[in-house]
From Swiss-Prot:
Keywords: Coiled coil, Repeat. Residues 1-26, 96-124 are annotated as: Disordered. PROSITE patterns: TROPOMYOSIN (PS00326). Residues 12-26 have a biased composition (Basic and acidic residues). This is Tropomyosin-1. Residues 107-121 have a biased composition (Polar residues). The keyword Repeat applies. It comes from Bombyx mori (Silk moth).
Length: 284
């Protein structure tokens, strides 16, 4: 009987121990389930974060690609604008050289015009002198003609004085011939000077036309220079703006690359954390 009691007590004790162990196992199971649920919740949260990071990663990659495209386009525009500025600078330099040459030609034409005007004034003065001399010669001829008439009258009235009258007549005729020669020479000189004056007049007209054309050319060059200077300023402004845009885009590219690197690190960290969580779940 005692043996049975002892055995019953032992069985009861074993039962109590089994119950305690069962309770402990149930509690451990509940704790494990709670930890599993918590880990699963953390996994779901990590998956959400990972998905968000992947979306951010893709978005940043797209932004980076677009920023690089914009940067390349702006660099092309900057190169084209710089080439345009260089071409405009060369054209402005050529226009300035042409303008300088035109101004030199205009100055030369003005100098020639001044010299031609002075020559024309000198010829006019000579013409007036010759005209005055011719007029004096004509007056002298008239005087000699009158003297000749008087001499002839004297010859008719005084035959006794024929020798003296003949000498006087011969002298008067010689003087008359000399005067006529001088008149002819003066007329020829006047004609020559008038012809030269006509040539000078034509030269003056030609020089005036050349000067006018040169002045027009200078004005055209000045207008072209003003227009090109305006275009050059616009091109330089565009180049400056393009350069600022390129710098701005370069900063944006650098920022996106940094952000992309940060997201990659976050992605790697989350992936490592998820691997650790899955390993922890596998341990349960």
């Amino acid at each position: 009987m005692d043996a049975i009691k002892k055995k019953m007590q032992a069985m009861k004790l074993e039962k109590d121990n089994a119950m305690d162990k069962a309770d402990t196992c149930e509690q451990q199971a509940r704790d494990a389930n709670l930890r599993a649920e918590k880990v699963n919740e953390e996994v779901r949260e990590l998956q959400k974060k990972l998905a968000q990071v992947e979306e951010d990663l893709i978005l940043n990659k797209n932004k980076l690609e677009q920023a690089n495209k914009d940067l390349e386009e702006k660099e092309k525009q900057l190169t084209a604008t710089e080439a345009e500025v260089a071409a405009l600078n060369r054209k402005v330099q050529q226009i300035e050289e042409d303008l300088e040459k035109s101004e030199e030609r205009s100055g030369t034409a003005q100098q020639k015009l001044l010299e031609a005007q002075q020559s024309a004034d000198e010829n006019n003065r000579m013409c007036k002198v010759l005209e005055n001399r011719a007029q004096q010669d004509e007056e002298r001829m008239d005087q000699l003609t009158n003297q000749l008439k008087e001499a002839r009258l004297l010859a008719e009235d005084a035959d006794g004085k024929s020798d003296e009258v003949s000498r006087k007549l011969a002298f008067v005729e010689d003087e008359l011939e000399v005067a006529e020669d001088r008149v002819k020479s003066g007329d020829a000189k006047i004609s020559e000077l008038e012809e030269e004056l006509k040539v000078v007049g034509n030269s003056l007209k030609s020089l005036e036309v050349s000067e006018e054309k040169a002045n027009q050319r200078v004005e055209e060059f000045k207008k072209q220079l003003k227009t090109l200077t305006g275009k050059l300023k616009e091109a330089e402004a565009r180049a400056e703006y393009a350069e600022k845009t390129v710098k701005k885009l370069q900063k944006e590219v650098d920022r996106l690359e940094d952000e992309l690197g940060i997201n990659k690190d976050r992605y790697k960290s989350l992936a490592d954390e998820m691997d650790s969580t899955f390993a922890e779940l596998a341990g349960y």
